[in-house]
Amino acid sequence: MLLTLAASLLIVNAVVIDGTGAPRRSAAVRVRGDRITEVGALAPAPGEAVVDAKGLVLAPGFIDTHSHGDRGLFEHGDALAAVSQGITTIVVGQDGGSPPLADFFARLDREPAAINVASYAGHGRLRGKVMGEDFRRHARPDEVARMRELLAQEMKAGALGLSSGLEYDPGIFSARSEVLDLAKVAAASGGRYISHVRSEDRYFWDAIDEIITIGREAKLPVQVSHVKLAMHSLWGQADRLLRMLDEARAAGVDITADIYPYLYWQSTLTVLFPERDFQNRATAEFVLREISTADDLLLGRFAPEPSYAGKTLAEIARLRGTDPPATLMALIQEALAFEAAHKDDDDVESVIGTSMSEPDLERLLAWPYANICTDGELDGRHPRGFGTYPRVLGRYVRERKVVSLEEAVRKMTGLAAHNVGLRDRGAIRPGAFADVVLFDPATVIDRATTRDPQARAAGIQRVWVNGAVVYEAGAPSGRRPGRALRRETTR
C-alpha cells in the first residue's frame, strides 16, 4: 500500500538521525499535512495512520546542492533518479546555466515534480543574453551593468544566488572583476555564490584563490562545486587545499564545498582544453598524461556518431586507426561541426573521465564544511545520478568508515540546507517540512555503474516529500508533492 501523509501519520520504532550531527535515538515522528509536528515517545492518536519503521533509520530527506535535474525535469516528473536514492530537494541552475527563473518557477507551480526544486541564476546565461555569440573576450562596463540588472531580476524571482561555470563557455572568458561585480548583486539580496571554479586541474590554486577573493570582497557565502583535485600531479594535496579553505574561514570568509563520491567526473571534451586550442597536439598529450588516460575517458554521448557512446577514447582510437591524441582532437572538431549545424542541440557530446585519487576524495569528503551532492541528471548517464547518497552511506560510512552515519546524514541534510540557504528543510524536528527518508543502514548501497548508470540503489525503503510518499518498495508512487523553493521564502 502506498502511504500518504495527507492528514496525520505516526512513524514508530524508528532510529532517528535528525540531520544536526546529534547521536541517533529511538523515537516516533508525527506528521500533520506537510510538517513534522512532534518527535519523541508518542502513542498513536485515534484514526491516525501508523508506519512501523522496524528499527530502520529515519533521516531528513537528502538535499542535492548541485543538480542538473532541471534538464528533463518536466519529462521526468517522478524524479526517479533522485527519490530512489532518498533525495527530496534538488538545487539547479548550476555551472552558470539556468532557465529564466520567473517562468521556470511558475511552471513548477503549475506542474509540480515529485521533489522540491530551488535554483541559482547562472552567470553563463546572463553573459550569453548580453553578449550573444561575441563572448570570447572580457565584457565591457556597459555589458556588466546589463548583467547586473538581469541578475537583480533573477534574484527578485527567487534565485538562491549566482552560479558560475568558469571552465565552460562563455564564463571562461570572463574577468574576475566581472564575476565579483555580479556576486555583489547577489549579496545585496541576501544571496550566495556557487562556482564550478575556473580550473580543477592546471590552474587550480589560482581558481581557489579567486573564489575566496570573491567571498571576501563581495561579503557573501561562497561554495566550491563538486570539489576535486582532478590532475595527477595534484594528487596528495587535499590537505593543502583544506588548509587554504580553513584559513579563509578563520579570516571571515564563509566558504564551503560540495562533493560526490566518485573518482570520475562527467563533462565535455572541450573543457579539457582551457585555452580552446583544440588542434594543439601538445595539449591533447598533456590531457591524456595528466588529466585522464585514453582508457579512462568514456564517451557518454556523441551525437555525430552515436555508436561511440559507451566506448573509451582508446577503443575509438583503435576503431579509427589513429592514436589517442589525434582521435581526441578529431572528436572535438566533429562535435563542434555538429553543434554548428544543429543550433538547437545543446547536448552534443559528454565524457566521463577518471581523474581523482581515493585518498584525496576521502579527505575532502570528511571536511566538516563539505556537503554531499550528485552533479547528476535525471536520465543518469553518470552513475552519480542514481547512486551518490547510497554510495556514501554504504561505501564510505559502513565499509570504509570515513565518517560516522550521523555525520554523513548531516552532510546530506542539515549542512546541505545551510550551505545553500534553505529554511525548515534538512531536519527532523517540530516545524520542519516533512521531507524524510527511511533506509536500512545495513544494506544501503549504490548499484549504478558506468555500464548500467540507471540501476537503482538498495536499502532505500520509503521517501516522503512535503508529507506525501513519493517512493516505496522500489517504485515511485506517482505523486507530485514537490514545490518550487524561491529564495524569498525557500518554502
Task: Report residues per predicted region.
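Divalent metal-binding pocket/active-site signature
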Residues: 153-210
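Acidic, glycine-enriched loop/beta-strand segments at the rims
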Residues: 16-28, 340-341, 345-356, 361, ...
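Divalent-metal coordination cores built from histidine and acidic residues
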Residues: 53-58, 62-67, 75-164, 183, ...
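Divalent metal-coordination and catalytic microenvironments
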Residues: 14, 29, 34, 55, ...
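C-terminal cap of metal-dependent C-N hydrolases
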Residues: 280-281, 362-369, 375, 388, ...
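Histidine-rich, glycine-flanked metal-binding segment
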Residues: 16-61
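Polyanionic/metal-chelating signatures
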Residues: 102-109, 113, 124-140, 147, ...
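Histidine-centered catalytic micro-motifs
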Residues: 61-72, 193-199
